[in-house]
Regions:
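Aromatic-rich carbohydrate-recognition surfaces in CAZymes
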Residues: 99, 108-112, 119, 272-304, ...
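The feature captures the catalytic groove of carbohydrate-active enzymes
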Residues: 267-271, 277-278, 346-348, 352, ...
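Non-catalytic C-terminal accessory modules of carbohydrate-active enzymes
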Residues: 157-158, 162-172, 590, 594-733
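Bacterial Sec-dependent N-terminal signal peptides
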Residues: 1-22
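Alpha-helix capping and helix-loop boundary segments enriched in small/acidic/polar residues
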Residues: 32-35, 82-86, 96, 122, ...
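Extended, well-ordered alpha-helical scaffold segments
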Residues: 333-336, 379-390, 436-453, 494, ...
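Extracellular/oxidizing-compartment recognition motifs
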Residues: 22-354, 363, 378-384, 401-408, ...
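Repeat-solenoid scaffold signature
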Residues: 110-129, 136, 569-598, 607
Length: 733
């Protein structure tokens, strides 16, 4: 019996040791400066495998970013997402290591970048750390991993990045590389505890790596006499700069920046490299964006530049959609809008990729529309992530605010928060994806937020101030009526989601509020335009547009509204999207395109920038970024109003195509829906309207001929999957 008991105790001890060996720990370097901002460190681990496994999933999380090499091969380029699925938790990656593993000896190396400061899209835990859990092969991060803080990585001097960016300006001192101060790592937490909170699986794919491309450069000088090597990039992109140089001495400071180093009138990311003697290759791993990459160094330097290159990375989706039409200006706009969209997608949606990298929800709604009509469905995950983050950051009092995730911003923009949950936000996402699960998840947050909105004695939406009562850039903003229109659209969205998710008991209250808002809103009609009695500025074109797109204005007012909009141009590129939509809905697509070309003409014609501005000119209001997410909204208007394409049953089970008569006489588009690619082309020959429609399996399209056209007296028809050639003839008045 004693022998049996001893054996049992021994087996328990072995089991405990095995279990302990399989525990993954948050680890960090044993260095007193490990939690300073912009700290870089490396972690190494050698291990042996008896055979090569077929599949090994490693769960990896970090504060803040990591690069992973397995047996010398790069397995992950800039892994990890900026922290903040909610206020306390962290995202983790799932990485398949099997393509890089082999029988026998293996080694892994992790390079960690710790931001160490807050930003408008990142929450710092306050502790640099990484955790790796591939327990199926016995590979877990613990004290057996060797690590060191890399002293070659430093921070550039002033000017520093502005307060919105968690990223710092990286300086790399090449003569300090190759250090060997490796020590056992510190174990400072386990999975799901400590400063990093619970761990949520990464909801979007790893970045697409387009590879390193050698670039042509021009040589010039700046006004200080420095050599400036300028690379004209194919377009405004997210990229990491690379170069190959020889320095006959050492200590030359090579500055690395783009034409967006002061994007939006504030300090953005840049980098420096301090040479060692001899030939050296370097890639600056902090991504930056721009149309022009610049490498700058003193004219006195004994430096030979062998090559300059760059690695473009970005959100992993495809430009599956296409569009071309008979109007070259619109084609050029479309290209710029797509570049503006894509460069504003990474960890989250951005308003701009240089100054802020922040997920403002007014911008997100504009980006969402473009994404659904032109990017592959893999992009939908970024929308879903944005939606989840918005509701998971909801304050205890019910307030929704953006940008999120954020550690140094918590102010509500009431108009943008209403936009996010409106028919242009959450419900719009549902119609394009059919994702009922997400709607069920967000509805309680929608209901809580809407409960904060009250009506005044006249029955109109009360002016909720929030933290920043912003309705649009520019002047003459009739804020009471803008809020009322967004409130109305948010209530309509809430009705839709409530009915979808089994909360019908809430619907009657929403409908009563909508009726009250509509009645009170229309009391503000003066016979020519909508104006709130307390507003004393010029009549606001934004309000007239919102009255139309929300349905608050009936068609009897359209001509007066049209006349008012023709005389007012106060909307910024953000709200101008809704102005064009309103004009098209009222049957004035010709003027919408005329106004569009007038107001967007400068930025479309600009050959220096491949993206669209924040304001109406470079350096305008809001900081004057030359790349801003909200300026591509006309792309969605063209799809939905001129081409007349939109889903009518969630998930594109059914769709409508009702083209408008417009100055665009010929066009073709491919829309990569969740059902497959919907293709539509038309040619307007005056008396004949020809259309070709290719419909994917599982979708029904209801085609309505342009006004004034018919086929054998038929104006409408329902079409199933397949390719359809249609010819309509102009009808006599």
């Amino acid at each position: 019996m004693r022998r049996i008991l001893s054996t049992f105790i021994l087996l328990c001890a072995v089991a405990i040791r095995v279990a302990t060996a399989q525990t993954a720990y948050w680890i960090t370097a044993d260095d007193s400066l490990r939690n300073e901002p912009n700290t870089w460190m490396e972690f190494r681990k050698d291990f042996t495998l008896k055979k090569r496994p077929k599949k090994v999933e490693a769960r990896i999380a970090a504060d803040s970013k990591y690069w992973l090499w397995v047996n010398g091969a790069l397995a992950v380029f800039e892994g990890g997402l900026k922290r903040g699925p909610n206020r306390t938790d962290t995202y983790y990656d799932v990485v398949d290591l099997s393509p890089y593993l082999r029988k026998g000896h293996n080694d892994v190396r992790v390079l960690l970048c710790y931001f160490g400061k807050p930003g408008f899209s990142h929450v710092s835990s306050g502790q640099s750390a990484v955790i790796v859990d591939a327990s199926s092969i016995g590979l877990v991060s613990d004290a057996s991993w060797q690590s060191q803080r890399l002293k070659a990585y430093q921070t550039c001097g002033e000017p520093y990045t502005n307060f919105r960016l968690a990223e710092s300006n990286i300086r790399y001192v090449a003569r300090m590389e190759g250090q060997n101060d490796l020590k056992p790592s510190l174990e400072i937490g386990t999975w799901g505890d400590g400063a990093w909170g619970k761990l949520a699986v990464r909801p979007i794919p790893q970045w697409r790596d387009y590879g390193v491309r050698t670039a042509h450069y021009d040589t010039g000088e700046d006004d200080q006499g420095n050599v400036v090597l300028s690379v004209r990039l194919p377009y405004n992109m997210q990229m990491t700069p690379c170069f190959d140089v020889t320095d006959e001495a050492e200590g030359t400071c090579i500055r690395i920046e783009t034409d967006h180093v002061r994007g939006g009138s504030d300090n953005c990311v840049r980098a420096e490299y301090i040479t060692r003697k001899g030939r050296q290759r370097y890639e600056s791993l902090g991504w930056m964006n721009g149309d022009v990459l610049r490498i700058i160094y003193p004219k006195s330097a004994r430096l030979t530049v062998h090559s300059i290159s760059y690695r473009e990375t970005g959100y992993d989706c495809d430009f599956e959609g296409t569009f071309t039409c008979s109007d070259s200006i619109i084609n050029r706009f479309w290209q710029k809008a797509m570049r503006t969209l894509y460069v504003n997608m990474r960890d989250n949606y951005f308003d701009c990729p240089d100054r802020e990298r922040a997920q403002w929800w007014g911008d997100a709604t504009i980006l969402m529309g473009q994404s659904f009509y032109q990017l592959s469905p893999r992009a939908n995950a970024l929308v879903r992530k944005a939606i989840h983050e918005l509701v998971d950051w909801q304050k205890e009092d019910g307030t929704l605010f953006s940008p999120i995730p954020a550690q140094n911003w918590d102010q509500e923009l009431p108009a943008q928060s209403l936009t996010s949950i409106s028919t242009y936000g959450f419900w719009y996402y549902y119609m394009h994806t059919g994702d009922r699960e997400t709607m069920a998840y967000v509805y309680p947050a929608m209901r809580r937020y809407l409960s904060l909105w009250t009506l005044d004695d006249d029955g109109l939406t009360y002016e909720r101030q929030g933290g920043w009562p912003w309705g649009d850039w520019g002047t003459d903003v009739d804020m009471r009526l803008i809020l009322a229109a967004w409130h109305y659209l948010a209530l309509q969205s809430a009705i839709n989601v409530a009915e979808l998710t089994g909360h019908e008991e809430d619907v009657s209250d929403y409908k009563q509020q909508m009726q009250s808002v509509m009645t009170a809103f229309n009391r503000c009609w003066n016979g020519y335009a909508y104006r709130h009695p307390t507003y004393h500025g010029a009549t606001d074109d934004r309000v007239q547009a919102m009255a139309v797109v929300s349905g608050l204005a009936d068609s009897t007012k359209y001509e007066r509204i049209y006349e008012t909009i023709c005389s007012q141009e106060y909307a910024s590129p953000y709200m101008e999207k809704y102005v064009y939509e309103a004009l098209m809905r009222m049957g004035h697509g010709d003027y919408a395109l005329e106004r569009f070309k007038k107001r967007f003409g400068q930025m479309i014609a600009d050959t220096c920038h491949t993206t669209l501005y924040e304001g109406w000119q470079e350096g305008g209001y809001g900081g004057g970024s030359t790349n801003h997410a909200w300026s591509g909204g006309m792309l969605t208007d063209i799809c939905e109003q001129i081409l007349g394409i939109r889903p009518t049953v969630a998930g594109w089970k059914e769709a409508i195509i009702h083209p408008a008569v417009s100055p665009i006489h010929e066009a073709s588009i491919v829309i990569p829906t969740v059902k497959g690619k919907l293709m539509y082309a038309f040619k307007d020959e005056g008396n004949i309207f020809r259309a070709t429609i290719s419909i994917p399996k599982g979708m029904t399209v209801h085609f309505i001929a342009p006004n004034g056209y018919a086929l054998n007296q038929r104006h409408e028809m329902s079409l199933k999957a397949g390719t359809h050639e249609l010819v309509f003839y102009k009808q006599s008045p």
